[in-house]
């Protein structure tokens, strides 16, 4: 929170708070004091978040706990946030029209917080801790690699499961004869296939004499029929 960029952003936040509170003007010295107070408050929240993280609280719940503790659920209403965001959009559109800037200009460029054609990321790199920035970039790259590997493994496993399911459901195919009676050439699934095997189990040892069952079905020449049991 000590960099020049962070200080400018905090000053803008203080000015916005004062403006919404009804103050039209403020002294530079008062603005500096309020900025320091806001900086201290944010750092205080950061320390509390780290302590909660050390206690095993998942990140998704930390912000909710802080909001409930600091503001109370009744005072932190969604309509207020939506109204604030709409106001920000209105301000940005007004500045776009007022100064004839391009639509690609961000609010930071419009308010002259960022130099022309400068990127926020590079300004943060110049004003912040370089080691911290490099560590964040490294974590982002590692996370992208893990996501790519997970996606690849998921696709491969899904294809393998789909292939096995298709073989299992249509192991017995295009049967001509069942128990000596002609049948339509249809695909038979696992349930019917197992029922047929159970009927033959009393008189035929399937594992030792597959030829007997093959003659009954008259389709042993179609190797696809019993490939799951060879």
Swiss-Prot record:
UniProt xrefs under Gene3D superfamilies: Histone, subunit A (1.10.20.10)
Database matches in Pfam families: Bromo_TP_like
Listed InterPro entries: Bromo_TP-like, Histone-fold
Source organism, top-level taxon: Eukaryota
One MF annotation (Gene Ontology) recorded for this entry: protein heterodimerization activity
Protein name: Uncharacterized protein ECU05_0510
Protein's organism: Encephalitozoon cuniculi (strain GB-M1) (Microsporidian parasite)
């Amino acid at each position: 929170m000590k960099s020049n960029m962070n200080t400018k952003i905090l000053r803008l936040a203080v000015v916005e708070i004062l403006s919404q509170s009804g103050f039209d003007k403020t002294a530079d010295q008062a603005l500096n004091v309020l900025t320091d107070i806001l900086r201290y408050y944010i750092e205080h929240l950061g320390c509390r978040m780290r302590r909660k993280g050390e206690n095993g609280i998942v990140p998704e719940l930390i912000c909710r706990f802080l909001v409930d503790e600091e503001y109370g659920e009744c005072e932190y209403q969604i309509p207020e946030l939506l109204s604030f965001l709409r106001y920000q959009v209105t301000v940005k559109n007004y500045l776009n029209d007022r100064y004839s800037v391009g639509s690609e200009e961000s609010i930071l460029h419009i308010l002259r917080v960022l130099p022309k054609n400068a990127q926020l990321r590079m300004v943060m790199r110049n004003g912040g801790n370089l080691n911290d920035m490099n560590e964040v970039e490294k974590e982002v790259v590692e996370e992208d690699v893990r996501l790519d590997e997970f996606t690849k493994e998921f696709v491969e496993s899904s294809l393998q499961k789909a292939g096995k399911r298709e073989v299992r459901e249509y192991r017995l195919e295009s049967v001509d004869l069942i128990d000596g009676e002609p049948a339509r050439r249809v695909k038979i699934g696992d349930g019917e296939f197992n029922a047929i095997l159970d009927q033959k189990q009393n008189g035929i040892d399937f594992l030792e004499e597959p030829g007997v069952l093959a003659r009954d079905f008259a389709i042993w020449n179609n190797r696809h029929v019993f490939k799951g049991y060879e």
